Regions:
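Short loop/turn segments that connect beta-strands within beta-propeller blades
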Residues: 75-78, 120-124, 204-208, 256-260, ...
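Cap/lid segment of the alpha/beta-hydrolase catalytic domain
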Residues: 241, 326, 429-548, 555-556, ...
């Protein structure tokens, strides 16, 4: 990667004095649940090939309690205010054409089928290129030559299209049954898709011809990339007939595009077994990079997702990150944006390096490694969360999104150098709101568990707090993800209500190396609980905390740990379990991701459930005395609502105070960060009401 001689970072801001900051803090107000509706979301940044502008999506809540997304463009130097390029309300996946003169994007109207639209980069009316049948489009992009567009598309089954639903309503007919022939027929946040699968299509813009070029992936979970000359596509896909139980059977396919639909499909031979995702063709066309691992496990799990490069001529593959302990899927969780679960992988335009996002010790950082091997270099500072966009054609600029505990996500452009990259912040959508609010910065601590293991945690104490406060321990979901240094509305809200908030990354979390993550493989409620106990012990020793008013809460796996904690420790004043797991045996059979026997857990739910049952909180609920608020979505396909029903029944049977809040089937497992806006606010009021009842 060549070194740049000069940069054009944004002008430094004057640092306020302590007295000025204190006065500003006193003039600000506490954050409220309703402020969640005022946050502006940004995503999917795309650097213009000429490096002058950056595309992104902007997401807001409208007056009708719905999310609107539109495509915006900003100058890369941040000197002019960003401007809307499309009108929405459901526009996204915006992509520059190779000469940056036009932008293609996907328009998803509420009742219409998805359409491919094109608008001039300088603005104006968007024109339709193609209307697809009713369905879902993802992974959209121009060919490098600009003659074609490729995209993944999954059709909606005919009986579930808007037209079919309206016909039934008009004629008083019932909805049809769902007839299922495979275990893969639903996904949380995506809903029920039955036998329909994503397929890869290529649109020849000049001829107006549309071809399906790949339909071999058993689950439809493939990812792809263009060859640098636009003549072919590389696809990471699993065509094993039992792909759900064999994620390691992923292969790399190449589709060579011929004239008038004459395409040739081949497979790259000699690759090791293992999951593969986000294949990326090198700029010279001689190598393919991807994120994955070797072995039978899938992408999500206790092992590190690593970076591989395959050389076509030498017919050999290198794992570039083998000597590191980084994971390319260490997502940082938040309620104010989408976690970066998918690997983010980019070639530097001259082919000398590969860039990726690495989650480490609570930060999400942009890093790189030489493409022929070497040391990892970090290019963004710790203490924030970065999500990577794309490079300009010359490689001197890289788009990204940055958030921090005191700053919701905004679009930035990095000026590329070998060390820490200077940044231009090009959006300020949330600045006016932030200027009103009294926000709290987390303070880092490292604790030692009783077995000597080090645990990173953070504390947030309300401003001007005096005396002993009630405190809340938040436990993250996953479990193979991390809490960290990003904007978290819920944490700030609890602080504003007078609670000291603690959060940590116990064993099982990502961001601390594979040994830390794998410590609880098939053994939840063991070393993770040891680490949580270390945090609890520190809270109970803290001089500013009332040890008799400590609560615990968490969602998903965090709900699991909340359930486990109250079954093994009677020192909590109250608890909140959200979209929880309580019974691992039943969860193995009713989640959208069924458990593979004798993989993550020893045995299986239907042959030898002993390990799962031993680790199930519900097996220990005869000991629970702690008042609990239970929150769950009836449309949760990840952790079925029956998990919370079991908790509720157990508590009611024993006379333990409880309140069960069930959100309708239109909501999913991700309701706290992506659910209907009014229900997200309702959830926050329920949380505050429960803590106010038991902790004040």
């Amino acid at each position: 990667m060549a070194k740049r001689k000069t940069t054009s970072g944004s002008a430094p801001r004057a640092r306020a004095s302590a007295r000025t900051r204190s006065a500003a803090s006193r003039s600000r107000r506490p954050i409220t649940p309703q402020d969640l509706l005022c946050l502006v979301g940004v995503g999917d940044t795309q650097m213009a090939p000429d490096g002058r502008s950056v595309l992104f999506t902007r997401k807001v809540v409208n007056a009708k309690n719905a999310y609107e997304t539109s495509v915006w463009v900003a100058d890369a130097d941040g000197k002019r205010a960003p401007r809307a390029l499309t009108t929405g309300p459901k526009d996204g996946l915006a992509r520059w054409n190779p000469d940056a003169s036009r932008v293609a994007f996907i328009r998803n109207d509420a009742k219409a089928a998805p359409r491919i639209m094109v608008v001039e980069a300088k603005g104006g009316k968007a024109h339709e290129l193609l209307e697809m049948p009713h369905g879902t489009v993802r992974d959209f992009g121009w060919s490098p030559c600009g003659r074609r567009l490729a995209f993944s598309f999954r059709a909606t089954a005919e009986e579930w299209t808007p037209e079919a639903k309206k016909h039934r309503e008009d004629h008083g007919l019932s909805n049809p049954p769902r007839v299922i022939d495979d275990v893969w027929y639903r996904l949380d946040g995506d809903g029920y898709f039955g036998a329909e699968r994503f397929e890869l299509y290529v649109l020849d813009i000049e001829r107006g011809a549309l071809d399906c070029v790949f339909d071999r992936d058993t689950l439809g979970n493939f990812s792809w990339d263009w060859a640098p000359d636009g003549s072919a596509l590389v696809i990471a896909a699993n065509d094993h007939p039992r792909a759900s139980w064999n994620p390691g059977e992923t292969e790399l396919f190449v589709v060579s595009l011929g004239d008038r639909g004459k395409h040739v499909l081949s497979k790259i031979p000699g690759l090791a077994k293992g999951p593969k995702s986000q294949p990326r063709w090198s700029p010279d066309g001689m190598r393919i990079a991807w994120a994955g691992r070797t072995g039978p496990d899938g992408m999500y799990g206790t092992g590190n997702v690593e970076l591989f490069v395959h050389e076509f001529q030498a017919k050999r593959t290198h794992c570039l990150t083998a000597k590191t302990d980084l994971c390319l899927m260490a997502a940082t969780l938040s309620d104010s944006g989408d976690p970066a679960f998918e690997p983010q992988l980019r070639w530097f335009p001259d082919g000398t390096a590969l860039f990726f996002r690495a989650g480490w010790h609570g930060s999400g950082r942009i890093a790189s490694i030489p493409s022929h091997g070497g040391e990892v270099a970090f290019h963004t500072e710790p203490g924030a969360e970065f999500n990577m966009g794309t490079f300009s054609a010359d490689g001197w600029r890289l788009s990204c999104i940055r958030s921090s505990p005191l700053q919701p996500a905004e679009v930035h452009v990095l000026e590329v150098e070998r060390s820490i990259f200077p940044m231009n912040r090009v959006t300020a959508f949330n600045d006016a709101l932030v200027a009103e609010l009294e926000l709290v910065a987390p303070e880092e601590r490292w604790l030692t568990a009783k077995d000597g293991h080090k645990v990173q945690c953070w504390t947030m104490r309300p401003h001007r707090a005096k005396g002993k406060l009630p405190a809340i321990l938040e436990v993250h979901g996953g479990p193979h993800a991390q809490y960290g240094l990003t904007f978290f509305h819920e944490f700030q809200l609890l602080c504003a209500q007078g609670y000291e908030v603690w959060f940590s990354n116990p064993r099982g979390s990502k961001g601390y190396g594979m040994k830390h993550t794998a410590a609880i493989r098939g053994a939840w409620g063991t070393k993770d609980w040891v680490d949580v106990q270390a945090v609890l012990a520190a809270m109970r020793r803290e001089k500013g905390i009332d040890a008799k008013r400590i609560g615990i809460m968490g969602g998903s796996y965090g709900g699991y740990m909340t359930n486990w904690a109250v079954a093994h420790d009677h020192g909590f004043r109250a608890a909140i379990t959200d979209r929880c797991v309580s019974n691992l045996v039943s969860h193995a059979g009713n989640s959208d991701h069924p458990e593979v026997p004798n993989k993550y857990w020893k045995g299986s739910a239907f042959t030898d459930p002993r390990a799962m049952w031993k680790s199930s909180p519900i097996a220990h609920f005869g000991n629970v005395r702690t008042p609990m608020l239970i929150i769950h979505s009836e449309g949760d396909l990840r952790c079925n609502v029956e998990q919370s029903e079991q908790v509720h029944t157990a508590l009611c049977t024993q006379g333990v105070p409880t309140r069960f809040v069930r959100y309708p089937k239109e909501t999913s497992h991700g309701m706290s960060r992506a659910g209907p806006p009014d229900l997200r606010i309702h959830r926050l009021h329920e949380i505050l009401g429960w803590w106010g009842r038991w902790m004040k």
